Amino acid sequence: VGGGIGHLSAWLFDLWCGEPSDEKQNIDLKPDSFIIVEEGARFGVIIDRLIRRYNAESWSRVIAKPWSEITAEVTSWSAAAASLPSSARPSDIPLPVSLIIVDLPDSERPDAASSAFDILSPDGLLIVPEPEVPTGDVGFPEEGKEPTEAQTKVIAFNKWISFIKRVSENHSVSFVELSGGTLAVIRRIA
C-alpha cells in the first residue's frame, strides 16, 4: 500500500524475478499474486510499466485507488457475499491477504494499518513503519481550524498507539529499529 514511484516494488521485483536484462537467471521466488495499491493514477502508470518490465503481468497488478476505498469495498463485498465461494466474490483484492506492507505518510499510516489488519489472513503479516514520534509541546488544535503539522503528528501517533494496544492484546507484535525509524511487524494469530 503506497507504491510511490515504485522503489520498494522495484526492489521486490528484483528479488523475485532477478535482473530483467539477464536472461540466464532462473529465479522462481515470486508470490502467487502481488497487488500494488497507489492512490495516484500517474504513479500507477509508472508502476504498471515496472510490472511489464519484469514480465510480471500474469501475477501482479497495480490498483490506482485510495486504500480506504479499497478496504471499505472489500469488507462490504465480503459481508454481502459471505455465502458464496471465494472465487465468486467480486473484489479488487482476493481475501484473505497473507502479507500487507504499508508505506504511506505518517498521518495516513495508523488508519491504513488498522484497515489492513482487518483483512489480514490468520497467520498473515502486516509490515509498517512506525509513525514519527512527536516531540515538544504542540498545544491543542483550535476549534474550527485545521491542526498544525506538529498537532497532526500527535494525532497520528495517538491513533498508532491505540491500534498497537488493540492488536497486541491477542496478536503478535514486534518492532525492529532501523536507521531513520522503527518497523512494526504484526502477525495475526489464528
Language model features: what each stretch is:
Residues 1-72:
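SAM cofactor-binding core of SAM-dependent methyltransferases
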